[in-house]
Amino acid sequence: MEEYEDFEMEDLSELVSYMDYLETQRLTISQLDYSLSIPPQLLVSREISKLEDEVCEMLKESSLFQLFRKHKGYLNVTDLVLPLWCEVQHEYYLLRRIKKKTPKMERGIKLHQILEYETSPPSERRVLDRTSKEEPWALRLLRQLEGIMLLQKNGITREFPIWGYYKESSIFGIIDEISLNNPSKSNFNSDIRNYFNFKMYDLSFVDNKTRFSSRKPGASQILSSKVQLMYYVHLFLNYFPSLGEKQQSIFRDISPTYSNRLHSQSHWWNMFLSQLSLDGTKDLGPKFLEQSILSIPDIPEDVFAGHNSLNGLYALVFASAKKLHLRLTDDNLTIAYRNDKTGEVVYKDKFSFSNKLLEASYTKAYQFWHNLREPEGVPAEEVYKCRSCEFQKECWWLKKKQYYPLSSP
């Protein structure tokens, strides 16, 4: 089974179950209009009374990123959006190293798996050499290649891994669903060297969220879902920059500071490999080559044999996507909320990409993960969130603000 970024334990996805029955007031971009300048100091000093002494000392020396994500070398997309619910709660979970898997989360994972298997059969691809740092990323590249072929053949692919940069941060995520508006199935050719030959189609992105009730999700939950999908779109376009080269779209300038770097295929890719200490030229070996050939039989064996490395597989993925002739439009982003038992879509929210919202959200998340300021808890109008929080009694933010979360919103 593929890894499901939405439900990784360290991403604290159990917060979604808290969000389900909570209503909230409407959030606007102005509520995320934080200063985009980074404070000069590296770490924020904390009052000892707010957290345990040893925790405070630890945070004076290291940031949350250094403590909990530096070993991976990147942040997951959900790492950037989950603190939007409550940064203080998120920090408590990280520092206490609390990991839970609830029945609701299990149902969500199962639903995602069912949706994935609707578009692609179960894969037996696995890491063959557990000492290799390159193989896990090679498997993700194979999944990308398979996803592009499914997109061409069936007009839809699900659980598409994607990674890259937003400003100074390396990010990894898994896109729930990518689809073409009017795909053609008639011109599929088994030879990768000439199977891409069809008209231009609009590209749509969908993020499937599990709902545990029939009620419309609250604005706070909708906000984080929108930001999450916008991260995916940003990563996808910068991973495949040729898709937006000739289009007059807001997607062309998502991250102006880094656009030149990210739009250079070799530059950003080599930078990513270097940051994670990966060898892009290392041959993945005969066993992995055999696995590649068996898992995607539509690609000729000699093609795989000539691309049996991270650089080689990325070149295949990049070349294949470049020939897709896709067109990106500003409003083809959708959040689909599904019943956790039946999988039925109970609510859809279609929206447009917002550079301002994404940048403001990212700046806040970056400051949180790198301890550039004190974590922020919920404002007074959202104190209802605290009723289901297990840190309610000890929460320093509530004590500081003198909120009373047991009262009704």
From Swiss-Prot:
Co-factor remark: Binds 1 [4Fe-4S] cluster.
Molecular function via GO: 4 iron, 4 sulfur cluster binding; DNA binding; metal ion binding; single-stranded DNA 5'-3' DNA exonuclease activity
UniProt-listed InterPro entries: EXOV
GO cellular component terms given for this protein: mitochondrion; nucleus
Co-factor(s): Mg(2+); [4Fe-4S] cluster
EC category name: hydrolase
Chain sites annotated for binding [4Fe-4S] cluster: 86, 386, 389, 395
Annotated binding of Mg(2+), by residue: 176, 207
Keywords: 4Fe-4S, Cytoplasm, DNA-binding, Exonuclease, Hydrolase, Iron, Iron-sulfur, Magnesium, Metal-binding, Mitochondrion, Nuclease, Nucleus
GO biological process terms held by the UniProt record: interstrand cross-link repair; mitochondrial DNA metabolic process; recombinational interstrand cross-link repair
The enzyme's E.C. designation: 3.1.-.-
Family: Belongs to the EXO5 family.
Subunit-structure text: Monomer.
Protein name: Exonuclease V
Native source species: Schizosaccharomyces pombe (strain 972 / ATCC 24843)
